[in-house]
């Protein structure tokens, strides 16, 4: 809101004449404009105060959050680490962990697989290929047992379907390779895995026996 002060009108007229406003309309307009005063200063001051308060609150909040974050960081320096020093340290694995595949043998050394092909039939990724032939005693044994590990989804269906616990997913999870061909497992590779991890595989099957 602006208000015209009559006491300042002569001074404003003189100032307008000095600045070159000689015509009457321009002289009167300049003089009137020079005599306006903004009298509603409380609203302007309140806006300035509100802005200052907002800036101060934001500044205080920023420093508060910064100090709180630094305090939390320092508190974790004196706690036990939540991570392990892998690969020199390894965490526990569940007996149901599904890792690298393996073919097992009986304690006598005879391979367990009876070439029923249930694992091949149930595999949703069609990663298993089996060929078999009968023996002289009438039993069937595999002549070919291949698993394409690049197709395998580690669902565990092959292990669940096997009636003699021949094909299993062992505890090994460190079997990365440099070539694609190394992930095409044949029967010899699978039997070697079974011989290597037999103790752990047998213990896991025994631990999970009551829940199957």
Curated annotation (Swiss-Prot):
Residues 104-133, 143-172 form the 4Fe-4S ferredoxin-type domain. Residues 1-34 form a transit peptide. The keyword Transport applies. Its EC number is 7.1.1.2. Keywords: 4Fe-4S, Electron transport, Iron, Iron-sulfur, Membrane, Metal-binding, Mitochondrion, Mitochondrion inner membrane, NAD, Oxidoreductase, Repeat, Respiratory chain, Transit peptide, Translocase, Transport, Ubiquinone. Its main location: mitochondrion. InterPro entries: 4Fe4S_Fe-S-bd (IPR017896), 4Fe4S_Fe_S_CS (IPR017900), NADH_quinone_OxRdtase_chainI (IPR010226). Belongs to the complex I 23 kDa subunit family. This is NADH dehydrogenase [ubiquinone] iron-sulfur protein 8, mitochondrial. It comes from Mus musculus (Mouse).
């Amino acid at each position: 809101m602006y208000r015209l002060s009559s006491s300042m009108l002569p001074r404003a007229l003189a100032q307008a004449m000095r600045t070159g406003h000689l015509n009457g309309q321009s002289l009167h307009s300049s003089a009137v404009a020079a005599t306006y005063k903004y009298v509603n200063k409380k609203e302007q001051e309140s806006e300035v105060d509100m802005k200052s308060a907002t800036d101060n609150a934001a500044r205080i909040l920023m420093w508060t959050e910064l100090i709180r974050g630094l305090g939390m960081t320092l508190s974790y320096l004196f706690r036990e680490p939540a991570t392990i020093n892998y690969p020199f340290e390894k965490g526990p694995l569940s007996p149901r962990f599904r890792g690298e595949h393996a073919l097992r043998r009986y304690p006598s050394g005879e391979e367990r697989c009876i070439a029923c092909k249930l694992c091949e039939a149930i595999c949703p990724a069609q990663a298993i290929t089996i060929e078999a032939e009968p023996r002289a005693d009438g039993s069937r044994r595999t002549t070919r047992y291949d698993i394409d590990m690049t197709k395998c989804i580690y669902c565990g269906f092959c292990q669940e379907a096997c009636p003699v616990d021949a094909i299993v997913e062992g505890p090994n999870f460190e079997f990365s390779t440099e070539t694609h061909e190394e992930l095409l497992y044949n029967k010899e590779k699978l039997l070697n895995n079974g011989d290597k991890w037999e103790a752990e595989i047998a213990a896991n099957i025994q631990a999970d026996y009551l829940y199957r």
